[in-house]
Amino acid sequence: MSDAEICPQCGWAFDTEALRANSCKKCRSALLITSVAYLEKFDRPAIQKYIARNSEVLRHDPEDQDALLSMGLCYLRLGLFELAEKFLGRLIDAHPEAASGYYYKAIGSLRGRRPRVATLNAIRAAEQLLLTAITLEPENGRHDIVLAAVRHDYYIMNGLRVPNPSPGDLVEGAEGKHLDRNEIGQGLALMNIPESSPFSPGLFATQT
């Protein structure tokens, strides 16, 4: 097997069945990091293993979609926002149809600052990225909810006029879509939006 077929965490060789399940049969770690939620329980050394593995993949194929996303998510989780933006920007350039690039770049673009204290230019840039993600992946409600949370925290909390669609309209539009509560919660946490926010994933009792 090639290097790309080795678990980044334990070095175990995996087969197509394990890849379909996205889980190493030996250590049960995710083989591909496609969501920041996969990194929730990993410490820095474990995340560095994913970075090392995907760096090797990118040396052979600089436009590998999975590796670019994984690198962006690992650096995002580590709070290294400039590096996260670099790889997510490369992902968007190489795969402009991939909604995840826009979604995570929007989150990282605030550099760990709460939307309420960000600049208007930063908010507008994040909004545009999230609107693009909604267009590309309309069935995934995470884009709608995170955009609603950003607009509520910046515009409403600062007493400013709210652009359309409003946070309420965005939440209503997310009904019936796929909602991953953990994924949404991780996204809000990376933007320092408090758990007391009306857009806390605890509001979404059912995943669809």
Please tell me what each predicted stretch does:
Residues 19, 62, 96, 138, ...:
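Short coil turns that delineate tetratricopeptide repeat
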Residues 79, 106, 110-118, 148, ...:
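Short coil/turn linking the two alpha-helices of tandem helical-hairpin repeats
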